[in-house]
Amino acid sequence: MADVTHLTHRPGPGRVVPVSTYRLQIHAGFGYDDAAARAAYLADLGVTHLYLSPVLQPAPGSTHGYDVLDHTRIHEEAGGREAFDRLVAAARKHGLGVIVDVVPNHMTVPRPTHLNAPLWSLLREGRESPYAAWFDVDWDVEDDRILMPVLGGTIGEAVERGDVVLAQDGGPSGREWVLWHHGDEFPVRPGTETLPLPELVEAQAYRLSS
């Protein structure tokens, strides 16, 4: 057995340890500037660190921040990067540290779907998407297709009822060929848009199912 007697949970020299954290739920109604305005009060309470809810760009209207759309941006409805920097400056002014939750393993399927650019690319290009490695996809299970369980029955029934519609009015540009299903938007693999609808749905990098 390894000798663990030398191990310790104490921090190394110069490391700051949170002693008392205060969690702040960031959203459009309580942004980074709102949090900054409370820095002095929280410091007076004896708080040592502000603990922020997820700070990355979530779906519009999110109140919790775990429904991430863009891992490269700070929550814009809460003030964006500039307001975030003001919060950090205010915290430092009052001797507070800042702990951020970045939830790198969280994403969401928004409406419209194209707001999540990595997911949109994955659905359009499948295994060839530059974002394919971002996702835990078992490509062998669905014959290189991504399962999207959004239907109330079979895809054949949905097509026959007219629940799945092809239109050139979606995607980031608003002019891409997409499949619509009751408000859910799915990209169409380039070059398949002229196929008959029953063939087109089977030619995509995803499989719509119940």
Residue ranges of predicted features:
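Acidic/aromatic-lined carbohydrate-recognition and catalytic surfaces
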Residues: 2-210
